[in-house]
Regions:
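Membrane-proximal basic amphipathic "stem/tether" segments
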Residues: 1-36, 145-156, 160, 169
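Active-site and donor-binding regions of nucleotide-sugar-utilizing enzymes
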Residues: 36-194
Length: 194
């Protein structure tokens, strides 16, 4: 299993900035449909996104399409075996579904769906644990870029980028009022969204 580092992850994001810009432009003329929700999880079918998918399917009208966006062919097969409407998140279909969906449910980040088409969607960030450690803006490790020096200007630019991305989160449910301030601080969110 590959290990994740923020330095490498941030480097990939910096290199993909043109794709983020093109994706953001593509979202401008598109009307998002309240009859389309997309779901994804950074570790595959599961986490909080799967129970929410099932609850939404049990309570929303059939006219609302719920789609699991899979990160691999194996995940796609698992999702379909579980009876979920599923597509690959990368590629044109995943981009178009994310682009048109009003609600985007994620557990790790925007990359759980198609990261380039999230602007303008209502992102529900379910996260994937209890924030006992420092996260995102509160952790110096988060603000590093592997191919750039660990300099205050680099960290400031990354912090600004993380704050900007955090503004794309519409709702961040937490387990208790005790952890809410950590999430507000870590993601640069207004308390009203947590």
């Amino acid at each position: 299993m590959a290990s994740f580092t923020f330095g490498a992850g941030n480097a990939r994001k910096v290199l993909r900035l043109p794709l983020y810009a093109l994706g953001a432009l593509a979202t401008l003329p598109v009307r998002r449909s309240p009859r389309l929700w997309v779901f994804g999880s950074g570790i595959g079918v599961g986490e909080g996104a799967l129970p929410l998918y099932r609850h939404a399917r049990a309570t929303l009208p059939e006219s609302v399409r719920l789609v699991w966006l899979a990160g691999s062919p194996a995940e796609l097969e698992i999702a379909r075996t579980l009876g979920l409407d599923a597509e690959m998140r990368s590629g044109w279909r995943g981009f178009r579904l994310t682009l048109r969906a009003r609600v985007l449910v994620v557990t790790h980040g925007f990359g759980d769906v198609n990261r380039f088409a999230t602007r303008g969607g209502f992102v529900v960030q379910l996260w994937h644990g209890i924030p006992l450690k420092r996260l995102h803006l509160d952790s110096p490790a988060t603000l590093r870029v592997s191919f750039l020096p660990n300099h205050r200007l680099v960290r400031a630019a990354m912090a600004r980028a993380y704050r900007f991305a955090g503004q794309g989160i519409g709702l961040f449910p937490v387990a208790s009022a005790l952890v809410a301030p950590r999430i507000v601080s870590a993601f640069g969110l207004p308390a009203s969204r947590v």
